[in-house]
């Protein structure tokens, strides 16, 4: 018989709660690219979806407070880039992602890769100030790794010629843009280290877009710079351009010309030393601020997990799940009832008295036709009788008498004059004929 302590025996709910906390605390924030499927937007305003690729899929939830910031309408089939934290939906034990931001895959992809690599290398200590090498106070030879046709090389050579013409320069020509550029620059750093012919290396180019400078965000190049035994100055773009190479190099110069000033001496070499220290201090401050920002983000993430809104989100997700289950149950009930009604209707049709009704209707139609025929005959007879009566009536009609040459004389008041004594001199008489009337005055 097995014997276990109470501490080793889990309930299902406790196990799911422990796994959820483990996922949320250990994994933190992740960036993920995938295709949307099973997208759902209930009345609660939250979004539920599945992110998948050709071999796997994961369920996701994006709560209303976060999806309001999404600038496009997601749909099944969209390729998206999401920022999310891992979690577990405890009621079902489903592993899921809680999405905090979403954008189409192409938008911001380079910036997200930049931030991810930056965090990775910082966590490994590649940006630590303790790993930085000091620049030689009096370099004997300077190596320049850049394009042999670019403006950066000519800017560096002009500054060195003006400030310290006797300082030897070794140029390691490479591409500084495109897919092969990072590998070429890493190989050039390796050659410079194996030859051991320079005291300091300048790696850089002129300004450009994020895509133009992307080769300086390459992980292989970054690790090669960090492993170099020769101090390296990163001089990429303009002062506002920042790359991974800037963080991992021993010192960052805002421009190629500034890098040349760092390795050359002139009458203001004391001021130059101050500039060097300022750059070191700025680099240290940037690293310190980056570390503090990362710690603040971690603390903020922990605080968000303990915020009541997080618990509300989980409860709302459970409510949405219950709502969807209720809808499915109602649909099944309605479907079952419809099928029962259809079966009863079919049985009723099999026993329908339609045929008998059709026969009775046929008989009724025949009776109706006979009745109509009888009515027609009766009407014909009555019309004939009416015509005969009309002829008889016409023979005694006053109008018929008028047509035979007779007339009727009346006073203006309409009284019929039948005798001469009925009128006097001056009376107006109206004599009605068959085709009109005459008016006359008695003299």
UniProtKB/Swiss-Prot annotation:
Subunit notes for this chain?
Heterooligomer composed of large and small subunits.
Q: Which family does it belong to?
A: Belongs to the XseA family.
Q: Where is this protein found?
A: Cytoplasm
What is the documented function of this protein?
Bidirectionally degrades single-stranded DNA into large acid-insoluble oligonucleotides, which are then degraded further into small acid-soluble oligonucleotides.
Catalytic activity of the protein = Exonucleolytic cleavage in either 5'- to 3'- or 3'- to 5'-direction to yield nucleoside 5'-phosphates
Question: Which Enzyme Commission number(s) are listed?
Answer: 3.1.11.6
Name the record gives this protein: Exodeoxyribonuclease 7 large subunit
A single GO BP: DNA catabolic process
Could you tell me which species this protein originates from? Answer: Vibrio campbellii (strain ATCC BAA-1116)
Q: What are the record keywords, sorted?
A: Cytoplasm, Exonuclease, Hydrolase, Nuclease
Which Pfam family, any one, appears in the UniProt record? tRNA_anti_2
CC annotations in GO: cytoplasm; exodeoxyribonuclease VII complex
Q: Which domain of life is it from?
A: Bacteria
Which is one GO molecular function term here? exodeoxyribonuclease VII activity
The principal localisation class reads cytoplasm
In the UniProt record, the gene name given for this protein reads xseA
